[in-house]
Each structure stands twice: as structure tokens, then as C-alpha cells.
Amino acid sequence: MLVETKARVGVFAIALGAYLPQFPTLVPEFEGQYAAFKKTVPDTVEVIDGGIVTTKEQSMAAGDKFRTADVDLVILQLLTYATSYNMLPAVRDLDVPIVLVNVQKKKAPDYANTDTPTWLGELYACGAVGEMVADLERAGKRHAVITGVVEGGDPGVQAEIEDWCRAAQVRRRFRDTNLAQIGRPYPGMMDLYIDETNLYNRMWLYTKQFDWEKMWAIADNVTDEEAIRAKAQDILDTFDIEGGGTIEKVWDMARYVVAFEQWVKDEKIAFVASHYDGFAKGVAGKLDSMLIPAFSMLIKQGTACAVEGDIKVSMAMSILKTIAGCGQLSEMYSIDFNEDICIIGHSGSGDADISKAKRPTMKIVPVFHGKTGGGYLTQFYPPVGDVTYLAITQDKDGHFKFVVAEGVNEPGPIFTFGDTNMRTRFSCGAREFCNRWSEAGPTHHMAAATGRHIDTILKVAKIFNVPVDIITR
């Protein structure tokens, strides 16, 4: 990615302090279990280690570390029974979910030969889970529980831990980067309009405003011909260009991409929402004609670029790019009633990482429908198979909401006029999907990613404390 971010995850373990002097063998036992547990947290995140907590004071010290680090998530290992005061001081001042990991060391007791310290050390992790959740509820904290076993390995537990860490990456990306708004939303698309201060207060995403005059001049000082040539080759490697492509043909486009990449790094931009509604002449027309593929090159590198000035869909694209590896802007295009299929897609910039069925294509059109000017269009080709859609919307009080659905992309004819589009079948049928999706009140744009990702999106939603409407899965 052009702007790298890394989630910070607070990790600690708790046990009842009264057990340790009674059964001293529990000390090395718990130390070994905690050391092994920390290794299950993927190295894609930064671990903030709160240690093994057996007293209120140790819990407060862990909480100080978590608060100072501004953790995106807390993962708590329950080693044995513990009272909730071992936990609450560590999380009291945090506004992130606490994931309680209840992993038992042994698959089953050796009933006849189990003594008290063996039971407490290897078989009693589940004893305090309900108590912890009860007090997290009373403290107004979000929470989740993962139950499993150490002996023999437990892929389900490992997958859940990794999924939570993947979701935590979204929060860190929102907090550590910026959103660039260039111009303003498409006139009259009021579902796209947004209060940027409310966005920051609720989602921790800061908006930087940029004028098109700056964008027109952004490449004026790019003179490194080696960098431009390398980027031109990157463009040719990414797209099949109608009529053939050469480095000379995409030279100006490559120069702008080099400039945009540096701008993204300098401004720490992970989201772009842009729309131009002026005269497509001169330098304005030049950039406007090549902006779609130029921004597609940014999307490929992790910066979500949305057309029509849609900030909310740029957020959805970034979420899916972060958790699923691709994020394609889409909207409801058409319904094939004969086949009970929804045609979903959009014109404009797209994500090469979703184009698994075919290499993306680029062609020149005389007019961008509904917009100023004409120029290059890019079309991407999502594969057949599972697909997830995510839209972000708001209620009348400004609270955000996720709207999600899973379906299956099927083979068959698609539109060929230059827009990305796919044929998606939903379990509820095309008519009912359109009704349910629309009734949820999303913006008319959504993001798409290959695979099924609702479970991870639910974790992201819990981290941001926003509700989710699941349309179908």
C-alpha cells in the first residue's frame, strides 16, 4: 500500500491471584500458556503486551499501556477462573471491543487422575466467561467470546483471532490516514452529502479538502523520466488498451500517476472522493480524460478512489480492500428477470485485484455519461463465485450504518460499453433483494469484494460501534 498502517492490539491474560501461593506450579504453567497464546496473534498487528494480570494494580498498569498506545482492539486470555476486577481496570477507559478468549489447554479431563492444580491450570478457563461479559455489559463495553481448545490445535480459534485482527486494521487505517475530497459531490445526489465533522467524530476519519486547480498542476514538476517510464509500463501491464498501448501513448497518464502517488504519501491519504463538473477543456480536460485509469492505479495500491464525490462509498471500498484484498465501487445496474439475476456495476475507477476473470481493459469514449467530457474508461472483470456487497449510510441523526449482502456471481453475458458489471444471484431472488436492499436506505453506491465477508464486516461494525443490516447471505 502507498500508505501503510498497522493495527495495535492490546493482549493480556488474567488469573485469580489467590491460587498462585496455594499452587505454585500454576505460575510457570500460566506463563507458558500465555507465551504460547501471544504467538497466535498474527504479526500483521502490533501487540501491546499487558502481561499476566492477577491483581487490580496490574490490571490498571495494563490499562495504562493500552490507553497510551491507543489500541484498536483488546484480546483477553482467560487462564483460569478470575474475578472481574482483574479485567475491568484494564479496559475501563477504552472504547474498543474486548475479545474474551476461552481456550482450554486439554481436550478433556482425565477424571480419575486430575488434582486441583491440574484442573485450575488446564481445564478451568471457562469458569469466568459469563462473569466477564456481565460486567462488560454493565460497563457499557462491546465484547465477543471465542471458545476452543489448545490440545491438538484449534483452527477455528486461530481463524477468529486473525479475523478480529483483520477487522482492527480498519480502525487503525481510519485513524492514521486522511480522506481527500476533490471538488464536491455530484449535484443533486443528496444521499452522498455528508457532514465531515460528524464523520470525524463518529468514525475518526479526517477530511482534507482539495481544489481541482491543485490537481491540474500536480504533475507540473514531475520530471523523472525513469519513474514516468516505469509507471507507464505498470499501466500497460495492468490494462489491455483498446487499439493497443505504448509507453508514449500513456506517458502523460503515467506522469500524473507518479504525481498522485507522491501526493498520497505526502498527505497520508487512504481515501479519495472526487467529482469534476466544470469545462473539460485545456489542462482540466486533459486530466479529466485520464483520471479514471490514473485513480485505478491508486486503488490497486490501497487508496480507495470513489467517483461522484462519494465519501461513504470510498470508506466501504477501503474496508473491503483492507479485510478482503479488493474493493470495487458498484451500484444496482439492471435486473435480468428472465434469469432472476441482478446486474451490478459502475463506470469509473476500479480495483485490478478484483479482475480475476480477465485482465482489465481501457478504452476511449467520446462522453462520460451524465458527466463532463470524455476520455478513458476502465472495465474490470470480477470472477464467478461468492461476492460481498457493502454500503454505508446514515440516519436522520447522522449515525452511520452498514448495509451488507452476500451473493454469487454467475457466468453469462455482461454489458460491454466500458463499465465494470457482474451478474449476481441472491438467495432471496432478484426482486426481493432489490426491495430489501433499497428499504435499508443505503446510498446508491456500494463496494464489492470477492468472497464472503459478512462475519468480518460484523467485527468491523462492532469496533466502530455501528449497526449492520444484513440483507441476505
Predicted feature locations:
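Short, well-structured alpha-helical segments in soluble
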Residues: 59-71, 88-90, 257-266
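Periplasmic-binding protein-like
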Residues: 71-80, 99-101, 269-275
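Extended hydrophobic packing segments that form well-structured cores
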Residues: 370-473
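Cap/lid and interdomain-hinge subdomains that line or gate substrate/regulatory clefts
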Residues: 2, 6-9, 107-232, 236-239
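C-terminal catalytic subdomain
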Residues: 296-416
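Short beta-strand elements in bilobed, periplasmic/extracellular small-molecule ligand-binding domains
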Residues: 31-55, 142-148, 205-211
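Short, acidic/small-residue loops that bind anionic groups at enzyme active sites
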Residues: 89-115, 120-128, 293-308
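Long, internal scaffold/assembly segments composed of regular secondary structure
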Residues: 232-323
